Amino acid sequence: MEYSTLIARLKTASESFENLEVQLADPDIANDPKKLESIARERSKLEPLVIDFNKLLDTDKEIEDSKNLLKENRNDKEMESLINEELINLEEIKNELIQKTTIALLPKDPRDERSVMLEIRAGAGGNEACIWAGDLARMYERYGQKIGWSVKPVSASESDMGGFKELVISVKGDSVYSQLKFEAGVHRVQRVPATESQGRVHTSTATVAVMPEADPVEVKIDPIDLEVGTARSGGAGGQNVNKVETAIDLLHKPTGIRVFCTQERSQLQNRERAMEILRAKLYEIQLKEANAKERSQRLSQVGTGDRSEKIRTYNFKDNRTTDHRLGSNFSLEPILAGQLDEVIDACIAQEQKRMMEDFNNEVN
């Protein structure tokens, strides 16, 4: 992007920020909590960009002053050397601010701020795949807890040998989807299973779907399309175990999507959870259809978000995790311990690079 174009866009953002501050001081808006919250949120989003824009303008002024000072001291070699050194430092600061503000101006995914439903399914590999699905669930639980998100299983189908055939986890917090969307796809593990007596390495898989939570307004579900059943669930213990039908078996007839929810204490709570999962699944279908054309045009994108795309291999023998989208290796143990920041940050950086290239092409 041309520097003049960047400055023009930053000025527009700065003017919007000033307008929001004026609105926040309006008594009429102050009496409307919902509108006040919306404006305050928008202002908060723009504030870091405006701060960096002002830093960029200040740096430009310092560069100009230093160049003028250089002209005045051409006969003073020592002074000239000091000024040139300062100019190099200022140009580095300017380039960093240009990079930072350009990234901040990139189009935002409106779903990035949402919480998600994380669905993990055992794939190829039988019982070992179920165990692997459980390992992935613990990995995401540790990652979420480290960040401060609320991580809670809402639906589970356990395997007889341990692990899960299928597990749905609710992950609530700030900007969850912006981080976890890069985890969607096939996760392959290569290791010697605990049940393997000959010491042979087995390959198993589990698929991860990352579904941003949807509002009822966005996904309308006609009650006539639902078939609701109940079942006994092992509740909180004591006399309630297996005696009260609190589990919900929900079938969406048009799509054939079935949700079985047992994790909550009451039938009403399980029904609400089941509806949340169903909405997220239907929203995922809507997004997939809406983005099909865009994805075909963006073959360089860091992952498609499709649950069938092989994204990562975890090799226990070599203590190595390979992310196939990045073509990079990471240490296995920290990854499984929930230290996903390095790999997720790398995915974000690559996606931002691709977006910047597209952005520059559109502008130029």
Swiss-Prot record:
GO terms for cellular component: cytoplasm. The modification N5-methylglutamine is found at residue 239. Peptide chain release factor 1 directs the termination of translation in response to the peptide chain termination codons UAG and UAA. GO terms for molecular function: translation release factor activity, codon specific. It comes from Prochlorococcus marinus (strain AS9601). This is Peptide chain release factor 1. It is found in: Cytoplasm. Belongs to the prokaryotic/mitochondrial release factor family. InterPro entries: PCRF, Pep_chain_release_fac_I, Pep_chain_release_fac_I_sf, Prokaryotic/Mito_RF, RF-1. Its main location: cytoplasm. Keywords: Cytoplasm, Methylation, Protein biosynthesis. NCBIfam families: prfA, PRK00591.1. Methylated by PrmC. Methylation increases the termination efficiency of RF1.
